[in-house]
């Protein structure tokens, strides 16, 4: 067994040897990111950016846009970030800066901006430039609604964390990500079901072929489902 493990480790090291010890930045300049919404999806994206992508040298989460709430709103959002029933505790530190309305997470200051509509915010005032805005509210899903984000100064592209409607592209990375062009300013990330099954179906189809099939999935009841 030990020989097998050693052999597997050597094989893996040989495959990834070009990446081992390579600390060359992926991007010449960190990519500014803005979250529109801070529900569970927004908080999980925040975790991915701040826990797994370093100290902002690749993706730099600059701001979160939410609706105005109670005076202790920022403290409530900090507590929600600290704990998740599935993913556990946040890996790092979270500090509330009331004066600047900022959450400092793992040393990264993230500004919380209060607004009700996408085109109300001038992001350039917050030193945000050519940002990718990730809309995780699901309120706007078509080109007309999501284009409102592009009217705000400081935003260059929009990603929706849900299926888009109309002519907008829905992208599942590893399946059709090569369909993205430089002209695309708005993209959708498709549905959770699509992301779960399509990569598997693609692999099976390419290797063996698929004549027909039936998909059955179990899901909690969403708000928009009439029972």
List PLM regions with ranges.
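Conserved small/polar residues in nucleotide/adenosyl-binding loops
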Residues: 1, 5-14, 217-222
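A structured beta-alpha segment of the ubiquitous adenosine-cofactor-binding alpha/beta core
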Residues: 88-145
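Rossmann-fold NAD(P)-binding glycine/threonine-rich loop
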Residues: 141-184
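Conserved anion/nucleotide-ligand pocket segment
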Residues: 196-199, 203-219, 223
């Amino acid at each position: 067994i030990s020989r097998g493990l050693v052999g597997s480790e050597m094989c893996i090291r040989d495959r990834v040897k070009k990446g081992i010890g390579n600390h060359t930045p992926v991007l010449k300049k960190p990519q500014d990111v803005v979250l529109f919404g801070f529900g569970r999806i927004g908080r999980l994206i925040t975790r991915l950016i701040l826990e797994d992508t370093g100290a902002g040298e690749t993706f730099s989460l600059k701001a979160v846009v939410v609706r105005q709430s109670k005076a202790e709103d920022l403290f409530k959002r900090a507590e929600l970030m600290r704990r998740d029933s599935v993913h556990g505790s946040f890996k790092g530190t979270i500090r509330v800066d009331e004066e600047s309305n900022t959450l400092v997470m793992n040393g990264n200051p993230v500004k919380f901006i209060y607004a009700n509509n996408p085109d109300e915010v001038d992001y350039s005032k917050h030193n945000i430039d050519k940002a990718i805005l990730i809309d995780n509210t699901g309120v706007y899903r078509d080109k007309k609604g999501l284009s409102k984000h592009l009217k705000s100064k400081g935003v260059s592209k929009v990603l929706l964390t849900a299926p888009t409607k109309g002519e907008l592209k829905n992208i599942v990375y590893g399946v059709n990500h090569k369909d993205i062009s430089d002209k695309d300013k708005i993209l959708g990330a498709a549905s959770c079901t699509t992301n779960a099954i399509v990569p598997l179906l693609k692999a099976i189809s390419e290797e063996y072929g698929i004549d027909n099939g039936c998909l059955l999935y179990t899901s909690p009841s969403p708000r928009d489902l009439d029972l």
